[in-house]
Amino acid sequence: MTDWTSLAYAVVDVEGNGQQPPDLVELAVVPIVGGKIGEPRSWLVRPERSIKYYATRVHGLTNDDVASQPPFAAIADEVRTALAVPALVAHNAHVDTGALQREFGDWQCPEVFDTLKLARRLLPRRESYQLGVLVKDFNLAADLPDNLTPHRAAYDVRVTARLFVHLATATDAQVLSLEALRGERAGDSDEATTLF
């Protein structure tokens, strides 16, 4: 069994403009290396299309907030560097990875650990797996700066990183292996299905 901390992760969260498909207006990335949560990076992004009112109601960002920010193309190399790890972590990850794939185009997404799916598998029979509920139930926002608010990328990426570490270390009072996080059973491997 492989220790989950042997892999480097980038936790990512994105916020969109509410268009279909959405343009990014904010994203944040925080590394997890050796099981330790690192320093987050965040970017505001000027989208090609305006931010819809209902999106502003969710994350609080307005068109004025991003009017003087760079377009994604101007920060793409920085973001690509921050995401250059063996694995990504996100809550409801298909939203984040889908938005990044649309922005990058040629991006090869690494292995993804979805904390929504992990929580459903590792914490069965909960009433809710919404990020906000899990944050409250496990006190994952403790000691965060007061200027951070839910549904902003800088907040969500931090609490998602804490949730991932919590899930990897607190299930039944044992640290999970990388294989267990992946949902692999003991003895599962590519070699087991090889005939020759």
Q: What role is predicted for each listed range?
A:
Residues 152-163:
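Acidic, divalent-metal-coordinating active-site segment for phosphoryl/phosphodiester hydrolysis
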Residues 55, 119, 177-181:
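Generic structural signal of hydrophobic/aromatic residues within well-ordered alpha-helices
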